[in-house]
Amino acid sequence: MTDDDRIKLEPSWKAALRAEFDQPYMHQLREFLRQEYAAGKEIYPPGPLIFNALNSTPLEQVKVVILGQDPYHGPGQAHGLCFSVQPGVPAPPSLVNIYKELQRDLNLPIPNHGYLQSWAEQGVLLLNTTMTVQRANAASHAKKGWEFFTDRIIQVVSEQCPNVVFLLWGAHAQSKQKLIDGTRHLVLKSVHPSPLSAYRGFFGCGHFSRANGFLQQHGMAPIDWSLPPL
């Protein structure tokens, strides 16, 4: 997001979000990130992957939205899709619990990796509400402006896409429910899949089968939640 490292944005999102790039919050966010890079701080995900969720899932293809909070802050993990890690990196604990629920819900095998790109390419928008983070410093880029931008993304999906399933796991994701038109979309809520909370209702929530049932009910192809081996 620096001036010399222009980030490409998929055309349908660029059109829908064009006005956001002229907002005061975006100028402040750009300046904050410029200073972080100038100070030599290591920022995740790498610049070209910051908008990977949008570039992997064009607006008109969105069927399911999963909200995360901010990117993983360990080296080599984050690549712009919430809950997902790059190939060769072990699946983090919350993602392992997502896999356990998929196995219980849809009888899918537990994948040997944590790379969720195939979900994104089928129409699952894997959106972190804060899109960057400093290495080893969780939530270091929270409340710097990203939330305005990602709130608008959620609103745009709610306004422009038909019959979307929103999966809101945990209090932070559920705080975004006010941005979603519940008369047009299916909103499914549970506790976060973190090991701290998954046993209080994430396991057994059945969100993946319920999402596919809703999509099929509205004439859309279901998501193949199984992941190809790497």
Swiss-Prot record:
Protein's name in the database: Uracil-DNA glycosylase
Xref: Pfam families: UDG
GO CC terms of this entry: cytoplasm
Location of the protein in the cell: Cytoplasm
Keyword Cytoplasm: yes
Active site: D70 (proton acceptor)
Name of the top EC class for this enzyme: hydrolase
Function: Excises uracil residues from the DNA which can arise as a result of misincorporation of dUMP residues by DNA polymerase or due to deamination of cytosine.
EC number assigned by the record: 3.2.2.27
Listed PROSITE patterns: U_DNA_GLYCOSYLASE (PS00130)
InterPro entries: UDG_fam1, Ura-DNA_Glyclase_AS, Uracil-DNA_glycosylase-like, Uracil-DNA_glycosylase-like_sf
Species of origin: Pseudomonas entomophila (strain L48)
Biological processes annotated in GO: base-excision repair, AP site formation via deaminated base removal
Family: Belongs to the uracil-DNA glycosylase (UDG) superfamily. UNG family.
Record's keyword terms, sorted: Cytoplasm, DNA damage, DNA repair, Hydrolase
Reaction catalysis annotation: Hydrolyzes single-stranded DNA or mismatched double-stranded DNA and polynucleotides, releasing free uracil
A GO molecular-function annotation: uracil DNA N-glycosylase activity
UniProt xrefs under NCBIfam families: PRK05254.1-1, PRK05254.1-2, PRK05254.1-4, PRK05254.1-5, ung
Record keyword DNA damage present: yes
